[in-house]
Design a protein with these regions (language model features):
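Metalloprotease/metallohydrolase-associated module, dominated by Zn2+-dependent proteases
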Residues: 139-153, 157-158, 174-224
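Metzincin-family zinc-dependent endopeptidase catalytic domain
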Residues: 51-170, 174
Length: 224
């Protein structure tokens, strides 16, 4: 894909040392989570090849940017870059397990902080619960997506909505409890298999979530 800037990450991403970090803890109601971004965040997809999974990330970014335009906010997700490599599945699983277990949020892991891009999207072959988390003071976020060969990401329409959902956390939204909406999640009983459908489509946001985004990123939001 010509639109994706190809950047090679040196020093072997597969050798990155696992470190614990806690994602934004899910909330039971819709609305804004952490502090808003102070700039348009660039995105780096970490994966082995410029393939179908990268295309899904680009489509999810385009979905969010269309939505921002529709609700009248100047905020956008920035350009999508590509880094050939991987973050070890055991590292991502350890972070995912900590997210579910709760605990205090540590500083951003050095290996994530040093990666290109403000939002790092890790497409993994591992089996863990996908997650999205932010470190607002560092203007950094990590979105980790489990293998699309494992249930439920192997179901039609699920992976694209999981990617969009986790990007929603990186943008600043929490979970809600409506299984017909994109941001439904724990502690509500809805799970990613609720996204399954024969035709590709992105699930919508609640009106309250759209209002929260407009409050986080108003007309005068300073895009720097």
């Amino acid at each position: 894909m010509a639109a994706i800037a190809r950047r090679q990450v040196t020093a072997g991403l597969a050798l990155l040392v696992p470190s614990l970090a806690l994602a934004q803890m899910p909330g039971i109601s819709s609305g804004a989570g952490p502090a808003p971004w102070r700039k348009i965040p660039s995105i780096t997809v970490v994966w082995f090849a410029d393939d179908e999974r990268v295309r899904i990330v680009r489509e999810a970014v385009a979905y969010w940017n269309r939505l921002f335009g529709e609700i009248g906010t100047p905020f956008r997700l920035g350009p999508v870059g590509y880094a050939a490599g991987t973050i070890p599945a055991d590292q991502l699983k350890a972070i995912s397990d900590q997210v579910l277990g709760g605990g205090a949020r540590p500083d951003v892991p050095v290996n994530i902080d040093q990666m290109p891009g403000d939002i790092v999207v890790a497409l993994s072959e591992g089996d863990f619960i996908s997650f999205g988390m932010r470190w607002p003071p560092r203007e950094k976020a990590l979105v980790a997506i489990k293998s699309n060969r494992r249930y439920p990401l192997d179901l039609g329409n699920v992976e694209r909505n999981v990617v969009a959902h986790e990007l929603g956390h990186a943008i600043g939204l929490r979970h809600n409890s409506d299984p017909t909406m994109l941001m439904c999640g724990r502690p509500a009983p809805c799970r990613p298999d609720a996204f399954a459908a024969a035709a590709d489509r992105f699930f919508p946001l609640l009106d309250g979530e759209k209002a929260a985004l407009r409050a986080m990123y108003p007309i005068g939001w300073p895009a720097r």
